[in-house]
Amino acid sequence: KNDLVELIDIVLSDLEKNKFISDKYYSESKAKNLIQRGSSINKIRNYLLSKGVQSKYIKETIDKIKENNDDQDFFSAVKLCKKKRIGPSRTDENRPLFYKKDIGILARNGFSFETSQRIMDLSKDDYNKIISLL
């Protein structure tokens, strides 16, 4: 049994040394994947924490995201609205009816109240322009 544990430790240390296992690379690639799916920075942070990634790597990853795009949460929220067909993607007559529900959906996905309000206040034309850029 001890031989097996030693063998596992040797294999793991070899994989870490050759960078096949790395919290840094995992956090960067997973964050990139989650951003493409429209996740907020808070949701990404909580996901990485739940996976046991070290805080320093999470901080580096979040800083890199903010460095690349200062308002990443806004664009991620726009992607989420498109994906779930909420907020500005609703028809104009339905938007006031679903305002609170849509704010709640955005909040549960980790977006701040200010970001959620900015999204909900977008006109249909502005929303479509932003979507065409993404």
Predicted segments — roles?
Residues 1-134:
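An alpha-helical, amphipathic repeat domain used for nucleic-acid recognition
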